[in-house]
Regions:
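Two-component/phosphorelay signaling modules centered on CheY-like receiver
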Residues: 11-29, 118
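Short hydrophobic/Thr-rich beta-strand motif most characteristic of the beta2 strand and flanking loop
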Residues: 25-32, 40, 102
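Active-site beta3 strand of CheY-like receiver
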Residues: 44-50
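Receiver (REC) domain active-site loop signature in two-component systems and cognate sites
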Residues: 55
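C-terminal output helix
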Residues: 106-115
Length: 123
């Protein structure tokens, strides 16, 4: 079974994302920040990360860089999600190693379809 991790410091946002993708029927982990996410991911590899950019302790950019540097996580897919919609924020996300970038508020149907496509599920 493929594993998904939702990384966001806001509990309500994690709950929203979990509700959107729960029908995909995958194991879903949660983390409040990049440090916690990395610790959990190194214990049980993650196939797909949904990562907020602005978080305490370790932001999404740094987390993405750490994921790309770890052999056991390097092939994971990363969707960066941010309230920032400026072109330079999106470019920085991709330079950090993100595969996809979405601006908040996230379109729930687009997120569900994207996650399904990434994991090879029909949605």
């Amino acid at each position: 079974m493929k594993n998904i991790m939702i990384v966001d410091d806001a509990t309500t946002v994690r709950m929203f994302h979990k509700g959107v993708i729960s029908s995909i029927n995958r194991h879903i982990e949660e983390a409040e920040n990049g440090v916690e996410a990395l610790e959990k991911a190194l214990k049980a590899p993650i196939d797909l990360f949904l990562v907020d950019i602005n978080m305490p302790k370790m932001d999404g950019y740094r987390l993405c860089q750490e994921i790309r540097q770890r052999d056991e996580l390097r092939t994971s897919t990363v969707i960066m999600i941010s309230t920032e919609s400026a072109k330079q924020d999106e470019e920085r996300a991709y330079r950090s190693g993100a595969n996809f970038y979405m601006s908040k508020p996230v379109d729930s149907e687009k997120l569900k379809v994207l996650v399904g496509v990434i994991l090879g599920d029909a949605v």
